[in-house]
Amino acid sequence: MLKNKTFKVTWNYISQTTFMYGSKVSFSNGEVTFINPLMPSGLPIHEWLMLKQFSKYKSAPSLPILRRGQHYKLHFDFDATPAGSVYFIIIFYNKNGTKLSTEIVKSNSITIQYPDEAYAYKIKMMNAACLL
């Protein structure tokens, strides 16, 4: 495992992967406020991708490249109202884009092992309640 290496992933802008239908999103002092009381549960609020086509997304990838077989500790720094209304999904893909495995994270941190067969991954922030 890599020791003392930290990569901070932040939500800095609205992208194609941000749920915007009826949403109010504001960015201030390094914090994001997302409000959408009518958003259905089970939909992604925002996604972070390791691989992106610049021509499609107009931005660089926001997740670091991970080493196969290595363990990583992920910490999610967020506040949600009501409590438990946000969770995260980590999805691993092989080289042809087929989903290998999925980790559902309902706490603030998790330790994962990057699969040996994985080529890419993404992280989705999901809505579990109607008020954030």
Residue map of PLM features:
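Extracellular and organelle-lumenal recognition/adhesion modules and their flexible linkers in secreted
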Residues: 1-132
